[in-house]
Design a protein with these regions (language model features):
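Extended amphipathic alpha-helical segments with heptad-repeat/coiled-coil character used for oligomerization
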Residues: 131-160
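Residue-level preference for alpha-helix termini and adjacent loops
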Residues: 14, 64, 102-105, 120, ...
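Surface-exposed patches in mature extracellular/periplasmic domains of secreted proteins
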Residues: 125-129
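Residue-level signal for alpha-helical context at structural boundaries
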Residues: 29, 130-131
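An acidic- and aromatic-residue-enriched active-site/binding cleft used to recognize and process polar
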Residues: 14-16, 76-77, 117, 142, ...
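Alpha/propeptide regions of enzymes that mature by internal proteolysis
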Residues: 88-122
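Short, solvent-exposed loop/turn segments at the edges of secondary structure
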Residues: 65-67, 94, 132
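A contiguous strand-loop segment
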Residues: 1-90, 123
């Protein structure tokens, strides 16, 4: 089980595993060349720092915070999470890209809520060795926090 919390400007989480996934501190500099699977390249974005497994020079973030103070964590949601097929007319983001997708362009939870309105989190695996993780997400800034859950009946966004 994973737990995340935020209070004022503090954001944190734990990763309750008795073994390592090779996690490390990862820093994605401002304007890093993100290549999203189903979207155009992100040429201008915020810097991000967090914990990730870095594979093939790509940070698979567990949790992170951007330079504006917006934090996001992916937490276990096994048996409940359901990600979707690519949908025309939506911003289709693979689940493994969801954290950098939000943190690269949003400075606040308020901005994240607007971006989420047209976001479709896709069941696209990183590669054959990394299946889609069953997660839900907490997004927080110093003023508010939300939980994002992708389930069989759609994406739900809850004030937290």
């Amino acid at each position: 089980m994973c737990t995340a919390l935020s209070f004022n400007q503090f954001f944190g989480r734990n990763l309750d595993y008795e073994f390592s996934y090779g996690e490390q501190v990862a820093v994605t500099p401002r304007n890093y060349d993100f290549h999203f699977r189903h979207l155009d390249q992100h040429e201008s974005h915020y810097a991000i720092v967090g914990m990730a497994h870095v594979f093939e020079e790509y940070p698979l973030y567990y949790d992170a915070m951007n330079e504006k103070g917006l934090g996001m964590a992916g937490l276990n949601f096994v048996g409940n999470a359901k990600f979707y097929e690519v949908k025309e007319g939506k911003n289709n983001v693979a689940a493994f890209e969801f954290i950098p997708w939000i943190l690269s362009q949003c400075a606040s939870v308020k901005e994240a809520k607007v971006v989420l309105e047209n976001t479709n989190v896709c069941a696209t695996p990183f590669n054959e060795h990394f299946p889609v993780a069953e997660l839900h997400y907490m997004i927080s800034d110093e003023h508010e926090s939300i939980v994002v859950e992708c389930m069989e009946d759609g994406m739900h966004v809850y004030d937290n």
